[in-house]
Amino acid sequence: MKCENCTKTECSKKKKTEENGEILDAMALADGEEKSEFHQLAEAKIFLSDCLACGNCVTSEEGAKIFAQNQKELFKVLNRNKKCDSSLHKLVVASISPQSVPYFAVKFHLSVCEASKKLCGFLKSLGVHHVLDTTIAADFSILETQKDFIQRFRRQTQDEHAFPMFASACPGWVQYAERVLGDSVTPHICTAKSPQQIMGSLVKGYFASSKNVSPDKIFHLMVAPCYDRKLEALREDYYTELYNCRDVDCVLTSGEVMQIMEQQNISVKEVMEFPLENLFGETSCVFVRHEGTSSDGYLAHVFRHAAKELFDMDVQEITYKALKNKDFLEVSLEKDGETVLRFAAAYGFRNIQNMVLKLRKGKFHYHFVEVLACPGGCLNGKGQAQTMDGKVERALLHEMEEVYTRVPIQNPESNPHIQALYEDWLQGAESQKTKQTLHTKIVASAQSAARLDMKW
């Protein structure tokens, strides 16, 4: 089985090109590291991140930069802070993805809240100065996605690309759309940044200003469930030339952080507990999540908002209908006997392939689709819930889903700091600064144009 649009006789995950794979393998062996995202492809299986790691999409330069995002990069900064003159020190800030915390909860045999405190304590014991909750970044991403949907709905008669609208939070999906699917798909993707990159903007922008620190004097670490987040952090539009720094300097997966704990032979019981901070220096013992799926619930939030904003309907309960498989779900809204909204969630490469095929045939009649590269969503990220040969650790995934559902829900609109940041820092919810800070450009690459005529 091969990726759609792939012209190779053998997958580059098995037979790597000299330019990309062999160089990276040599680097890995020289450093005594595992090969991480460049592992062998599981037989008869294709994952979206495997496709993205093919030499046709990821250049050797990108591959080297992805590989360099490891614990050595973190410890290089931490050790420099201990040994060098204070003028060369960096403020080390770690942002924790909400989907990573359930992984540590299961591994530590603790509640999500307790696990977040242990994780915070461990990172601080290494020399990290601030460990931040990223809920506010997901709040902004959801709210901006809601706004984008309403605007598209109101201009749909003038814009042939208004619908379906695809969520943009998954970097694997966005990279695949830009580099392979091209401009037949990219105009349909929401321009709101992912929570990771909004957090990057907040840390290198608002947080840096509040601490009176230049953005290039902050080392921003992101702990995430997914290897594709490493590639996302390298996007050109997330780099600031003025300060010669990226919004997110290093991404470590949940599994990589756990490896650091194991290598240092640290017992969870020995780790002191510290609550996560927010951008304002406040701490809370309560860990919250968003309604809907474990991937921040874009479908649920956009659906409820659209029902109220467009049709003045309050949706009390959302009913998900599984179609061909459990990773393709449908939600619809009826008014006066007519279906006025049709939403879907499409997880995994196979469902993405089917979705795009129907879109090109004009048979994909949805208003909004929550698209994720990993089957089962972000909890099933390859950086925490999958083995190196691509097999899902189902028991672990099930436990993570169980603990995640016990976390209390908070709607983005309920976050008291959101409106303050819109008004005081972003100069208004509709300002140019808001668009520059919270949105990105989804652009088809030159490579994709050559592939549009290929058969599906």
From Swiss-Prot:
<dbReference type="Pfam" id="PF02256">
    <property type="entry name" value="Fe_hyd_SSU"/>
</dbReference>
<dbReference type="InterPro" id="IPR003149">
    <property type="entry name" value="Fe_hydrogenase_ssu"/>
</dbReference>
<dbReference type="GO" id="GO:0005521">
    <property type="term" value="F:lamin binding"/>
</dbReference>
<comment type="similarity">
    <text>Belongs to the NARF family.</text>
</comment>
<protein>
    <recommendedName>
        <fullName>Nuclear prelamin A recognition factor</fullName>
    </recommendedName>
</protein>
<dbReference type="InterPro" id="IPR009016">
    <property type="entry name" value="Fe_hydrogenase"/>
</dbReference>
<keyword id="KW-0539">Nucleus</keyword>
<dbReference type="InterPro" id="IPR004108">
    <property type="entry name" value="Fe_hydrogenase_lsu_C"/>
</dbReference>
<dbReference type="InterPro" id="IPR050340">
    <property type="entry name" value="Cytosolic_Fe-S_CAF"/>
</dbReference>
<dbReference type="Pfam" id="PF02906">
    <property type="entry name" value="Fe_hyd_lg_C"/>
</dbReference>
<dbReference type="GO" id="GO:0005638">
    <property type="term" value="C:lamin filament"/>
</dbReference>
